[in-house]
Design a protein with these regions (language model features):
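A conserved beta-strand element that flanks and buttresses the S-adenosyl-L-methionine
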Residues: 101
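Short catalytic micro-motifs in class I SAM-dependent methyltransferases
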Residues: 104-105
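A short glycine-rich, Lys/Arg-flanked "PGG" loop and its adjoining helix->strand segment in the class I
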Residues: 115-127
C-alpha cells in the first residue's frame, strides 16, 4: 500500500471532489444489523471522513488513515473526533474495538498484506467483534493513479478471512455498475 496518490494536498483535494457524492450509508446499515449502537469502532482509511460522520451517529468511532493530508483534513473538519495515523496492514495500536469498518480501502493491499491485516484485525477486536469491509469485485490487479488495486471475489475473500473470522455474509452490491462491489461481514472467532 505504498502509493503516493493520497499523500499530497492536491491529490487529497481531487479525491474529495471526485468522491463528494459517494458514501457507505447502505454498508453501514448492514453493519448496524450486526453490531449494537454505542460500540467502539475503528474505521480503517477514513479519507475525507464521509463514512466516519455516518458511523459517528451510532458508534464511538476512531477514524484512521495512513495519509497525513487526510488526517489534517479530518481533524480540521472534526476537531472533537478521534483519529489515528495507521497503516492498514500493521494497524499499530494498543486500542481494542468492538468493530472494524472500511469502505474500499483494503483492496489496496496485496494478497499477503491482506492476510497480515486480517490477522491484526482479529488481534485488536474484542471477543465476538464484527468487521465490515467493502471491496471492488473482479479478478487480478492494476495500478490506478499510482495506487495498487487488488480485485476480489467471494472465493478470495473467504480464503483470506476464514481462519480468523466466522463469515456472516459476503454480498455483491452496486456502487457504480451492477454487482461491481462486495461487502464482507464477519465475526471474530
Amino acid at each position: 500500500m505504498k502509493g503516493e496518490y493520497y499523500k499530497t494536498k492536491a491529490s487529497v483535494e481531487e479525491y474529495i471532489k471526485l468522491a463528494k457524492d459517494v458514501n457507505g450509508k447502505q454498508l453501514i446499515e448492514k453493519f448496524k444489523q450486526t453490531l449494537p449502537s454505542n460500540s467502539t469502532i475503528l474505521e480503517i482509511g477514513s479519507g475525507p471522513g464521509t463514512d466516519w460522520k455516518i458511523l459517528n451517529e451510532f458508534y464511538d468511532v476512531t477514524g484512521s488513515d495512513n495519509s497525513n493530508e487526510f488526517l489534517n483534513y479530518l481533524v480540521s473538519k472534526n476537531p472533537k473526533g478521534k483519529f489515528l495515523e495507521l497503516d492498514a496492514i500493521s494497524l499499530k495500536t494498543n486500542m481494542k474495538f468492538d468493530g472494524i469498518y472500511s469502505n474500499k480501502v483494503l483492496h489496496h493491499l496485496k494478497d499477503s498484506e491482506l492476510i497480515d491485516s486480517v490477522k491484526r484485525q482479529n488481534e485488536i477486536l474484542n471477543s465476538n467483534g464484527i468487521i465490515c469491509h467493502s471491496f471492488w469485485k473482479g479478478n487480478g490487479s492494476e495500478i490506478f493513479k499510482g495506487l495498487f488495486v487488488n480485485y476480489h471475489s467471494i472465493q478470495t475473500l473467504t480464503k483470506a478471512y476464514k481462519n480468523y473470522f466466522e463469515i456472516l455474509s459476503i454480498e455483491e452490491y452496486k456502487e457504480f455498475d451492477e454487482n461491481d462491489s462486495l461487502l464482507l461481514l464477519a465475526r471474530k472467532i
